[in-house]
C-alpha cells in the first residue's frame, strides 16, 4: 500500500489573473496523484490550522509572508514557493531587498522558477539556504498561452473579435514606470 500524497493548497489572491492558471496546476497535480484545494489566499491563511498537513504554494517570500510561514510550519505544512514577479524583475540587489526575505525563505522547502534565468537569480541571493532545491518548471500563467490551451478561451476570444475586430493590444501599466499613482513609480524620467 502506498502512502497518500499530501494535499496541495493553492491560494488565489487575484481571481482574474490567477484562477485559471491555478486550476490548470491543480489538474496537472491531480494527474500525478495530488488532491488540491484552491481558494482565497486570505481565507486559506486565516484557516490554515483547519487543513491536514499539506503543501502550501506561496507566490512570494517577502517579509509580509514571514508570520504566515511561521504559523503554517507550526501546523506541519510544507511551504513551496514561486515568485509571481520574477519573470521580469528589477536589478538583483533591488529585487532581493523587495521580493526576498532571509527569514521567510528559511521556511521554504522548494523553489519553483519561471526559467533558468530566474533560478540563477535566486542562486545569487546571499541568504539562499544551501539545501533548498530550485526546480525550473515554468509557471501556469505562461502555460495558459500554449497553443493546445487556446480553445479554453475560444468563446471569449471570439466575442472580443466580434466587438472590436482586429486590433493590437499595447499594455502600458508597468508598475515600475506607470503605476496607478506617480509617487509609486520606481523609475522617474
Residues of each region from the PLM?
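Phosphate-coordination loops involved in phosphoryl transfer and adenosine-cofactor binding
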Residues: 4-5, 165
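A solvent-exposed, charged loop/short amphipathic helix patch at secondary-structure junctions
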Residues: 181-189
